[in-house]
Amino acid sequence: MKAHVYVTLKQTVLDPQGQAIHGALRKMQYQGIEDVRQGKYFVIRLSDSLDAAAAKAEIERIANDVLTNPVIEEFTFRLEE
């Protein structure tokens, strides 16, 4: 089983890298781009012995304890068989 974990800054936190990318896209005349937020992406391979509920709990614990700074970041994830 794999977990795909996406970590982003909270909407209330300024994202200077996202703003820089947005500015570059505008200068390059890309159309229809309203906002850019940058983040991190992790793929975590889990033991096949974990059921879906245990895998979900483990990923939530890992994301909260290791992958994010909960003051400024949030995460989402999806599990893949």
Segments the model singles out, each with a brief description of its role:
Residues 1-11, 40-43:
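Short glycine-/aliphatic-rich beta-strand segments at the starts of folded cytosolic domains
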Residues 38-51:
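Short, charge-patterned binding micro-sites
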